[in-house]
Design a protein with these regions (language model features):
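Cytochrome P450 catalytic-core helices
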Residues: 50, 162-187, 302-319
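Conserved cytochrome P450 K-helix/beta-meander segment immediately N-terminal to the heme-binding cysteine loop
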Residues: 134, 252-281
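Cytochrome P450 heme-thiolate "Cys pocket" and heme-binding signature region
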Residues: 9, 153, 158, 200-203, ...
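Cytochrome P450 I-helix active-site segment
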Residues: 20, 24, 72-77, 126-135, ...
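Active-site rim elements
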Residues: 39, 97-104, 202-205, 296-302
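Cytochrome P450 heme-thiolate monooxygenase catalytic core
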Residues: 2, 15-166, 183, 188, ...
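Cytochrome P450 proximal C-terminal region
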Residues: 27, 75-76, 189-193, 235, ...
């Protein structure tokens, strides 16, 4: 919990307006040449855009020089990280087997990038506490440089790949649902900040995006940003007659739970309209919908990610 408190300040609601301004500029900048192309490869575009947003907002950094290296290393690293839940797999990490060797190379590369980001910030002598990296660097006497590096790596890994995947799935679902796509386009056309070509506040973005929000909620139901949450039982317990001993590895799957027909009628159908009633989510039992996790380990960047995704959806719907 102490670690969580240390990481909370950059994600407070009071910072969201400044983040939305940065996001707005970066989405404009990143998508300006899309009009000249017949088609684009959306997944890598979303990866690059969300990396730019996280880098600029949380690290005060232009990420262009690292985009390709991070993308290549992330693909290898995430595959291995997702297999962490397989007991005993870590014994093979230093085995020299090709798969594990590739992970070691990718991991080392990401560490080098994180260290370069930190060094560049220190050399710039701009160690202000107006973003996450600045806050961490001002605590250098209390936490080690290795700790700071690990936090930067965690945010690079968790702060852009998850959002990029959700966006790719959202646009995929929209491409197959012209009625919902038209609703989103109408919402973008009606947004005053888009009409006036200006940056919205966080509240203005939230108020102008009920359709975009429903699209995101339904997309995260069927294609959650994290599909499984590994946990370790802290005490002996019994669930539905099954005894779970203290120390047991327990896997809780968003992907499976979000498809439970008891909570979501026609669970395999992508239907944003189910979220149109504001009371629908409130009526769901605790733990039936948790795209950002839950409890004391719930994702700190939830509102940051939702603002980013709403903005991308509306701006792309308006311009393309």
């Amino acid at each position: 919990l102490a670690h969580r408190r240390m990481m909370q300040p950059p994600f407070h609601h009071g910072n969201l307006d400044s983040y939305v301004a940065i996001m707005h500029n970066l989405v404009n900048e990143h998508t300006k040449d899309w009009q000249d192309k017949k088609s684009i490869e959306l997944a890598p575009e979303m990866m690059a855009l969300t990396l730019e947003i996280v880098s600029r907002c949380l690290f005060g950094l232009d990420s262009h020089q690292y985009t390709k290296a991070i993308a290549e290393s992330m693909e290898v690293a995430i595959d291995r990280i997702e297999r962490t839940m397989l007991p005993g797999l870590e014994r093979f990490d230093k085995s020299g087997i090709k798969y594990f060797k590739e992970f070691e190379v990718a991991s080392d590369r990401l560490v080098e990038i994180a260290e370069a980001i930190i060094s560049k910030r220190i050399e710039s002598k701009e160690v202000k506490n107006d973003d996450l990296l600045g806050i961490l660097l001002q605590m250098k006497g209390e936490i080690s440089v290795d700790h700071i590096r690990d936090e930067v790596l965690t945010l690079i890994l968790s702060g852009h790949e998850t959002t990029a995947n959700v966006m790719s799935w959202a646009f995929s679902y929209l491409s197959k649902n012209p009625k919902v796509r038209k609703q989103l386009e109408d919402e973008a056309d009606a947004a005053s900040w888009i009409k006036e070509n200006r940056t919205p506040t966080y509240q203005e973005l939230e108020d102008s995006s009920p359709v975009a929000s429903a699209i995101l909620q339904e997309t995260m139901r069927l294609a959650p940003p994290v599909w499984i949450a590994p946990r370790i039982a802290t005490e002996d317990c019994t669930i539905d007659g099954i005894k779970i001993p203290k120390g047991a590895h327990v896997l809780v799957s968003q992907y499976v739970t979000h498809r439970n027909a008891r909570f979501f009628p026609e669970p395999e159908k992508w239907d944003p309209s189910r979220w149109a009633d504001a009371n629908f989510e409130k009526s769901l039992p605790r733990g039936s919908y948790f795209p950002f996790g839950g409890g004391s380990r719930k994702c700190l960047g939830e509102y940051f990610a939702i603002a980013e995704a709403r903005l991308i959806l509306l701006m792309v719907a308006k311009n393309f």
